Amino acid sequence: MAPTEMNIERKVEADVAVIPNDGKRAYVTFLAGNQDYWMGVVGLAKGLRKVKAAYPLVVAMLPDVPKEHRQILVAQGCIIREIEPVYPPENQAGYAMAYYVINYSKLRIWEFVEYEKMIYLDGDIQVFSNIDHLFDTPSGYLYAVKDCFCEGSWSKTPQYKIGYCQQSPEKVRWPMNSLGHVPPLYFNAGMLVFEPNLLTYEDLLQTVQVTTPTSFAEQPIPSTYNLVLAMLWRHPECIDLDQINVVHYCAKGSKPWRFTGEEEHMDREDIKMLVKKWWDIYEDTSLDYKTFVENESKLNPIVAALASKESGCDGLTSLAPSAAKSNP
């Protein structure tokens, strides 16, 4: 099924001042549905403020996100970009978990061509150190972190079943005699540094229409920029928590806003500590957008002037509508 034409953003009412930037760089995340994933996006927005990120957070959002959730995100300083779904081809409908069908729509972020470079972060990610320097990586590459095959989403693959993982391939050797060539490197798509480009978007769209999901050329960056929690118990020798910049709460039962500690591995002290760190940020009212801007304005007259100039705004939209339109 061909994707539908992308809508221009819809204006969302809110009484929050808008602080514009040059429009060249931004963080971006994705949201769909009416469940509680908006809480993850709020946590991410506040986390980026806590580490003094210099660039805004854009939320690529499907039309089914309720108005109430949109208003919450706008009030947290997020830039709302409504997108239309991208549907997987019929031959891939049963490839992986059901929510992966929704995840095809993330390809739309390559259409955000008003930005020169973006850093994509899943909504269940939290940043604990400033990562703005990743915007300065050489252009022309997709930057990502190698995935861990020990994570549950790989459970139906040969890699998972035999205990082979590209994070520590020396632990379990790949049986070439029975399974053929060693699998190509795969990255975890929860964190990406990329350059929006319409030709790239069309190439990606054509690729998923005719092939099964696979890896494509990228430049690896250290796992400190996307710690998949399964690494803590599968590859502890690879992890130094003091050096971690970005944590991906993707293991079963690890979403902080749903955390009970009852699922497997969730009773670990390091997991509890990381969940607490997420909640400390989420519940910190000084990191709420309006409060943060007011406090920063007292210290920075330039910020104060910008906030005053924009104080009449009743909504927050992206800096410019995307020029992108998909083919009918």
From Swiss-Prot:
Manganese found in the keyword field: yes
UniProt GO BP: galactose metabolic process
Domain of life (superkingdom): Eukaryota
PANTHER family the UniProt entry points to: GLYCOGENIN SUBFAMILY MEMBER
The protein's Enzyme Commission number: 2.4.1.123
Gene Ontology molecular function: any one: inositol 3-alpha-galactosyltransferase activity
Job of this protein: Galactinol synthase involved in the biosynthesis of raffinose family oligosaccharides (RFOs) that function as osmoprotectants. May promote plant stress tolerance.
Reactions catalysed: myo-inositol + UDP-alpha-D-galactose = alpha-D-galactosyl-(1->3)-1D-myo-inositol + UDP + H(+)
InterPro entries reported in the protein's UniProt record: Glyco_trans_8 (IPR002495), GNT1/Glycosyltrans_8 (IPR050587), Nucleotide-diphossugar_trans (IPR029044)
Active site as annotated: K106
Residues engaged in binding Mn(2+): D122, D124, H248
Any Pfam family matching the protein: Glyco_transf_8
Localization per record: Cytoplasm
Required cofactor(s): a divalent metal cation
Keywords of this entry: Carbohydrate metabolism, Cytoplasm, Galactose metabolism, Glycosyltransferase, Manganese, Metal-binding, Transferase
GO cellular component: cytoplasm
Gene3D superfamilies, alphabetized: Spore Coat Polysaccharide Biosynthesis Protein SpsA, Chain A
Keyword Metal-binding: yes
Gene name in the database record: GOLS10
Family named by the database record: Belongs to the glycosyltransferase 8 family. Galactosyltransferase subfamily.
Name of the protein in question: Galactinol synthase 10
